[in-house]
Amino acid sequence: MQPFTSLTGRAVSLRRGQVDTDQIIPAEYLKRVTRSGFADGLFAAWRADPDFVLNQPYAEGAEILIAGPDFGIGSSREHAVWALLDYGFRVVISARFGDIFRNNSVQAGLLPVRLPAATVTTLADAVEADPATVVTVDLAGREVRASQQAGGPVLLRAPIEIDDYTRWRLLEGLDDVSLTLRNAEEIARYEESRPQWLPVAG
């Protein structure tokens, strides 16, 4: 997966709490056998409403989603994360995430940023007041910043709450498969030393 160090770009605000994975991508869009091609299903029911935030011109090209609390609850479908990535989001900011959704996000390279509810509200207020607000998510520096323009005065600054191991994996772009392949030579040597009558990994 793609490493994540820092991202500066525009954000959109979705002020809905308890958004479950079926709302993120309905079941009828899960028929693909690949990990791509799910963008059309993202928030499909809500996107039928012309007033929905992702249908607004200012939302085009946004890479950061500011969500309400308890985002990604419900079923364990990985497609919810894949749909967000396919649409172009690299970061989701919320006060709370569903545990399985958060783990799936880390595995796929989507950064789930947990901030205090009041901070999320302040950030959403700024983005809604001025969609051109620039948001920086600096994983390397463990910080979220917002300003009215790139390089301008900082409107908001907040630390990112993330454990060292998860941060390291995202910075390096390592999912479980990539982590295993880092030890490919050791695994091969172990397999070669096993008795022939035992099964091998290959």
Where are the regions a protein language model picked out?
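Cytosolic catalytic domains that perform sulfur/thiol-centered chemistry
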Residues: 1-202
